[in-house]
Amino acid sequence: MTQTGEPTMYKSIVIAAALFNEGATTRAALTKAQTLLDDGGTITLVHVIDEVPGYVAASIPKEHLSARRREVDDQLAQIAKSAQGMNVKTVIREGQPSASILGAAKEAGADLIMIASHKPGLSDYFIGSTAARIVRHAPVSVLVTR
């Protein structure tokens, strides 16, 4: 809230888009983002496809990788379409998730990043979760949902 008691609104919100479970967590984040977005603001859905190491990529048909990217693009478009009347953009990146999401947020001029978290597994204790890395390194507010 501002000092006058009015709710703080955001001009540019980046949502880290998870597409498992038909994008249910991303759809929930989009619904929440709509309540936080300033009139005329922009929501950017960012999905990161893990980079396939070169030695593995050589054995995967290019058609398979292209088909996966089209599938992700279609899923993001469907989710974006559900936010009727809102300015929603979609971005697909390849690479390390937290760095890619932070880069997309910088490019979008985001003043809020939204990301879903999960209950930590054993690997999260050793290498850390994407959400934790984003919270530590983001130069803007981060809203973590479960």
Name each region found by the language model:
Residues 3-59:
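Small/aliphatic-rich secondary-structure junction motif
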Residues 62-74:
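A short acidic, glycine-rich active-site loop
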Residues 115-133:
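Glycine-rich, Arg-bearing micro-motifs that act as flexible, cationic patches
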Residues 44-46, 89-93, 143:
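General small-molecule cofactor/ligand-binding pocket signal
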Residues 37-39, 84, 139:
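Short conserved AdoMet
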Residues 137-146:
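Short, flexible loop segments at boundaries between secondary-structure elements
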